[in-house]
Amino acid sequence: MPLPPVAAVPVSAPERAFPCGQPGHPCVLARLQAGRRWIWIEGNHDPGPVELGGSHLAEMRLGALVYRHIAQKGAEGEVSGHYHPKHRVSGAGPARAAFIYDQRRLILPAYGTYTGGLSTTDPAISALFKRPAIAVLTGSRAIPTPL
């Protein structure tokens, strides 16, 4: 079964896609890529899955936004990944993968079995955001939480 962002591709029918992480199963991916411009945002561990087709960029600008793997301090309009943020709401069970955003940037969660995660309170993440920042916990129900 495709992970949540991959499962949304057939439903939303985007003209282009720019995944910021590992590709998943090649057969599923080939179907999703058909008829779309596919741009891989390269990570820090590899140059991108060149055998799977599409373009491979270290970062991509699209209007006022810049997509890159690792957030850069002081950047504006930035969408990144790398940190695999997770957050825990007191009394609400274990930490969950989370989107984190403020008025300047968005850090995407990781979807996968072996991705781990870094707490939103870790200085590597918290130093990137101005208050108020919001963590949106993923799961069967999105839970927005002020940081």
How would you label these PLM feature ranges?
Residues 1-147:
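Extended recognition/assembly regions associated with phosphoester-bond processing machinery
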